[in-house]
UniProtKB/Swiss-Prot annotation:
A Pfam family reported for this protein in Swiss-Prot or TrEMBL: HisG
Complexes and interactors: Heteromultimer composed of HisG and HisZ subunits.
Superkingdom of this protein's organism: Bacteria
Record-linked Gene3D superfamilies: Periplasmic binding protein-like II
Lineage: Bacteria, Bacillati, Cyanobacteriota, Cyanophyceae, Synechococcales
Protein name in UniProt: ATP phosphoribosyltransferase
GO cellular component: cytoplasm
GO molecular function: ATP binding; ATP phosphoribosyltransferase activity
Subcellular locations according to the entry: Cytoplasm
Catalysed reactions, as listed in the record: 1-(5-phospho-beta-D-ribosyl)-ATP + diphosphate = 5-phospho-alpha-D-ribose 1-diphosphate + ATP
Length: 212
């Protein structure tokens, strides 16, 4: 039986739809009153683990799941050893650098040396500023990073931006995009090597239906 790590939250509905098109139906995971964290597909050929988006690469890397769907932002930040299989195209958003709207910062190089930048994505943020040769102090926050500039703790933030509504409501503006993030299909390397074609067939089905 194939084990699949599905991400809770914004990516879940499209993730379930992706596997349903490939013949694995986990629609019961969307039932409002269902509190279970594991689900069998209707065909009994696979089971799903419902986990936090950030934990998907962990379950796949350690072999507790054969396949998983995760945002590229999380995948890039985690740096765990997984097979990167497909760009699924949904869940698109930018990883962006943003500052207070009333600041004088129009581009990254306008930021003062050694200023504080708040982010949940500290590896991504650090790498970005190192490539630009701009010395900054990365402040790791796990909640609403927009509060960094609002409270004066940080001059800027590095965070995911979908519509920009949250930035606007908090008086922030983008001054640069680091990359575009979408949902990715990943696999456990050992599972892929030992596969008896069940994984391969599922991946090919997802690839073909996703291309339509």
């Amino acid at each position: 039986m194939i084990t699949i790590a599905l991400p809770k939250g914004a990516l879940l509905k499209d993730s379930i739809s992706t596997f349903k098109k490939a013949g694995l139906d986990f629609s019961n995971a969307l039932e409002e009153n269902n509190r279970s964290l594991t689900f069998e597909s209707n065909c009994k050929r696979a089971k799903a683990l419902l986990v936090r988006n950030g934990d998907v690469p962990v379950y796949v890397s350690y072999g507790q799941a054969d396949l998983g769907i995760v945002g590229y932002d999380v995948l890039r930040e985690s740096e765990l050893k997984v097979a990167k299989l497909l760009d699924l195209g949904f869940g698109g958003c930018h990883m962006s650098l943003a500052v207070k709207k009333n600041s004088n910062y129009l581009k990254p190089t306008d930021l003062p040396a050694n200023c504080k930048v708040a982010s949940k994505f500290i590896k991504t943020a650090r790498s970005y500023f190192e490539e630009l040769n701009i010395p900054v102090e990365i402040v790791h926050l796990t909640g609403s990073v927009e509060l960094g500039p609002i409270t004066g703790m940080a001059e800027a933030i590095v965070d995911l931006v979908a519509t920009g509504k949250t930035l606007k409501e908090n008086g922030l503006i983008k001054i640069d995009d680091l990359y575009y993030s979408t949902a990715r299909l990943i696999g456990n390397p050992l599972s892929m090597r030992l596969d008896d074609n069940h994984l391969r067939d599922t991946i090919l089905s997802i690839e073909s239906t996703n291309a339509l």
